[in-house]
Amino acid sequence: MAASVQPACLDLHFSGKHPPLLKHNAIIVRCVSSPNVIPEADSISGPPDIINTNRDQRKVVRIAWEKLVRWSRSLRAKAKTDVLERTRKVVVLGGGSFGTAMAAHVARRKEGLEVNMLVRDSFVCQSINENHHNCKYFPEHKLPENVIATTDAKAALLDADYCLHAVPVQFSSSFLEGIADYVDPGLPFISLSKGLELNTLRMMSQIIPIALKNPRQPFVALSGPSFALELMNNLPTAMVVASKDKKLANAVQQLLASSYLRINTSSDVTGVEIAGALKNVLAIAAGIVDGMNLGNNSMAALVSQGCSEIRWLATKMGAKPTTITGLSGTGDIMLTCFVNLSRNRTVGVRLGSGETLDDILTSMNQVAEGVATAGAVIALAQKYNVKLPVLTAVAKIIDNELTPTKAVLELMNLPQIEEV
């Protein structure tokens, strides 16, 4: 029997607390650590091929990173700031959580920028103006002093350079019709609302011009993985603005982008909007799976299937497949399906736990857009001749035509298919 081979002691010295492991020919050698000896990199001995390879890899990584940093600095140096400089007033329609977070963000972009929030609740209005807090949604967060609230639509919209629309989709038509007389026909609308109008299947890009009776009203959709609370806390966030007007998309990018908020641009308005709407329905499905304690395997399978369904429908509607895999698609889906801050996911969890939809909605102080949007899914599936089993199951559960348990059984018994 051959004698066992013991690795020779290598006199390697490193200054760190935990000396690294060198792996060579399946023998792992722990190097000796000495606090008194800090060698030069070139003095490290060992198998030449491994050391040279590691040095080459480190060099490649270092060069790649340095190139990236130089490229980034170069673009930042050339970035235009004229949009922010000439913007004097921004109006935010709606005093909910996301409208408040975006109002605070825009106000922090420039001192002296007037940010007007049009709110319905006079108590919230007073709280913002006197105490600089939205007492209903962010009572512990102080708003910038250049955020001003009002219940007067005419005053809020007067001389505004940009309008951020944060009214829930199902109430947007009636709300906009009520303020249409005060809206400048050239005022760009940046929609923060995600969903489909239940009776008409319209997206916000269709609702706004129809309600305002102006087919040329400038429009931008803002979407992506973004919780209002994290935006309020200045945590790193990335979103996308979509508009058929590239110049307008670039202008809104300049207006909103900051050191903690990245803004990409897109021309695919349909893709950004439909992904943002349907991900809310999928989040309800994900919540149901969690509420029923069906495990991680089923969660992954369901969300994967739901992503495919969103892609199938979106592309039939004219969206680009790449949009669905971007921030407004996959990014937003991941956030809303897997994180408990999601209102739509919370609705699903409670449905899966056995609560009734009426009890759930009565106890909530914010709108879960996916509940109403789910009702539009079946009509869209029929209109575009697309099978959407997961999203349709959610609509049936919400309409009380299917129990979560029965829905799971039906979905698991669907025909075995080839993945596409």
UniProtKB/Swiss-Prot annotation:
Disruption phenotype: No visible phenotype under normal growth conditions, but leaves have decreased levels of hexadecatrienoic fatty acid (16:3) and increased levels of oleic acid (18:1).
Domain of life: Eukaryota
Record-listed substrate binding positions: 194, 343-344
Pathways involved: Membrane lipid metabolism; glycerophospholipid metabolism
Listed Pfam families: NAD_Gly3P_dh_C (PF07479), NAD_Gly3P_dh_N (PF01210)
Any GO BP: glycerol-3-phosphate catabolic process
Broad class of the protein's primary localization: plastid
First-level EC class: oxidoreductase
EC number(s) on file: 1.1.1.8
Interval spanned by the transit peptide: 1-45
Subcellular location(s) per record: Plastid, Chloroplast
Keywords: Chloroplast, Lipid biosynthesis, Lipid metabolism, NAD, Oxidoreductase, Phospholipid biosynthesis, Phospholipid metabolism, Plant defense, Plastid, Transit peptide
Active site, renumbered: 279 (proton acceptor)
Entry GO CC: chloroplast envelope
Family listed: Belongs to the NAD-dependent glycerol-3-phosphate dehydrogenase family.
Function according to Swiss-Prot or TrEMBL: Required to supply glycerol-3-phosphate in the chloroplast for the synthesis of glycerolipids. Required for activation of systemic acquired resistance (SAR). Provision of glycerol-3-phosphate may be involved in generating lipid signals necessary for mediating defense responses and SAR.
Identification of the protein by name: Glycerol-3-phosphate dehydrogenase [NAD(+)] 2, chloroplastic
Annotated source species: Arabidopsis thaliana
Protein encoded by which gene: GLY1
